[in-house]
């Protein structure tokens, strides 16, 4: 590049900075690469599967799955973790179904949670944009895309055909907010539902998500959550075993998976993950039904081991740090509490 070209380029950069703000156009070599900031999901295994220690800040996230698979529970845990780190969170409850009592049990500070229950889709997305523009909110959850009903559909008759209105609404909203999210360092999580494709034949998945294709493209991370087992204690169901697959990941390698327990009335079982990953990585020793850490036995069976870790948070944190170190993740990237529920005897060996 000759001197005239360099001067022209510098002038162009100055004009762009003046018009749109300093730092709008930069040379990558002029600025140190900053590690991705994250919000923990509340699940150690899922944070590891995401590759960066949690959900990336300033991005669009989609969490989808069948009914009662744990979608809302996962987002409530993310809210709780963001609040623990001093963040402000908002919950746009388009389904009008937020269980405040359950949110409290999971660890959400409901007194300081911003909640909106919009009447129609346009209102919900206007609220979303306004909240993001404020620059004061760290995490927004929209529950759910399927419930973002366009106003024209609400005002119309039952037999009116409104083809593609919701998809166009979502596409317009995402075009407007995606750039804002990065600028304001705010993360938005869209909860979505699954539908079956009509007339699907041949190869490919018969499932699809609602709201058109825009959300698939704009999302930096897409998580597919499925219930794979019901956890029982005797005859009583006390939780679900779920599997989360990272279907799309723009900040790390995709297609990794994590499994964990969601206990009714408690949420994600943290100490259960510590036992599982501890054994998998040879940090916790397992001999028969007994689990031990170092020279000390921590319990007979998985349930008793979880109770021990719950009662001894310093040991739990030590095991967690060793797991993170073994997996090559900086423990500062993942910050979460050690509160947890008792597990079930049905999972004991």
UniProtKB/Swiss-Prot annotation:
Q: Which UniProt keywords apply?
A: ATP-binding, Cytoplasm, DNA damage, DNA recombination, DNA repair, DNA-binding, Nucleotide-binding, SOS response
GO molecular function annotations of the record:
ATP binding; ATP hydrolysis activity; ATP-dependent DNA damage sensor activity; damaged DNA binding; single-stranded DNA binding
User: What does the entry list under GO cellular component?
Assistant: cytosol
Out of the domains of life, which is the source?
Bacteria
Listed as disulfide-bonded, the cysteine pairs are: none
- The UniProt record lists the keyword ATP-binding: yes
Gene3D superfamilies hit by this protein: P-loop containing nucleotide triphosphate hydrolases
Q: Sorted alphabetically, which InterPro entries does this protein's record hold?
A: AAA+_ATPase, DNA_recomb/repair_RecA, DNA_recomb/repair_RecA_CS, P-loop_NTPase, RecA-like_C, RecA-like_N, RecA_ATP-bd, RecA_C_sf
Give the subcellular location.
Cytoplasm
The similarity comment for this entry is:
Belongs to the RecA family.
NCBIfam families assigned to the protein according to its UniProt record, in alphabetical order: tigrfam_recA (TIGR02012)
Tell me the PANTHER family matching this sequence. Answer: MITOCHONDRIAL DNA REPAIR PROTEIN RECA HOMOLOG-RELATED, RECA
Function per UniProt: Can catalyze the hydrolysis of ATP in the presence of single-stranded DNA, the ATP-dependent uptake of single-stranded DNA by duplex DNA, and the ATP-dependent hybridization of homologous single-stranded DNAs. It interacts with LexA causing its activation and leading to its autocatalytic cleavage.
What name has this protein been given in UniProt?
Protein RecA
- What species does this protein belong to? Aliarcobacter butzleri (strain RM4018) (Arcobacter butzleri)
What is the primary gene name for this protein?
A: recA
